[in-house]
Amino acid sequence: MATKDTGGGQQKATRSTEEVEEQAQDAQASEDLAERQEKLSDDVDSVLDEIDDVLEENAEDFVRSFVQKGGQ
């Protein structure tokens, strides 16, 4: 009786060079995005601190500048 090989042998989990390069690019992109996000967070914090300083110095004038005049 003949036996049939179903190909159920062990498969090696190997990655092609392209997959490795793609993962390296993804990792670099993630690092770049993290750096951009950190810089933007710092910029936003800086702007908010500046607004707080202006409000602490002269809140009344700041609010008056945004009040609509003459129904406009």
Curated annotation (Swiss-Prot):
Pathway: Protein degradation; proteasomal Pup-dependent pathway. Is modified by deamidation of its C-terminal glutamine to glutamate by the deamidase Dop, a prerequisite to the subsequent pupylation process. There is a cross-link at Q72 (Isoglutamyl lysine isopeptide (Gln-Lys) (interchain with K-? in acceptor proteins)). Residues 28-66 are annotated as: ARC ATPase binding. Residues 33-42 have a biased composition (Basic and acidic residues). One of its GO terms (molecular function) is protein tag activity. Residues 1-10 have a biased composition (Gly residues). GO terms for biological process: modification-dependent protein catabolic process; proteasomal protein catabolic process; protein pupylation. Residues 1-45 are annotated as: Disordered. It comes from the Bacteria. InterPro entries: Ubiquitin-like_Pup (IPR008515). The modification Deamidated glutamine is found at Q72. Residues 10-60 form a coiled coil. Keywords: Coiled coil, Isopeptide bond, Ubl conjugation pathway. Strongly interacts with the proteasome-associated ATPase ARC through a hydrophobic interface; the interacting region of Pup lies in its C-terminal half. There is one Pup binding site per ARC hexamer ring. The N-terminal unstructured half of Pup provides a signal required to initiate unfolding and degradation by the proteasome but is not needed for pupylation, while the C-terminal helical half of Pup interacts with ARC to target proteins to the proteasome. Protein modifier that is covalently attached to lysine residues of substrate proteins, thereby targeting them for proteasomal degradation. The tagging system is termed pupylation. Belongs to the prokaryotic ubiquitin-like protein family. This is Prokaryotic ubiquitin-like protein Pup. It comes from Streptomyces griseus subsp. griseus (strain JCM 4626 / CBS 651.72 / NBRC 13350 / KCC S-0626 / ISP 5235).
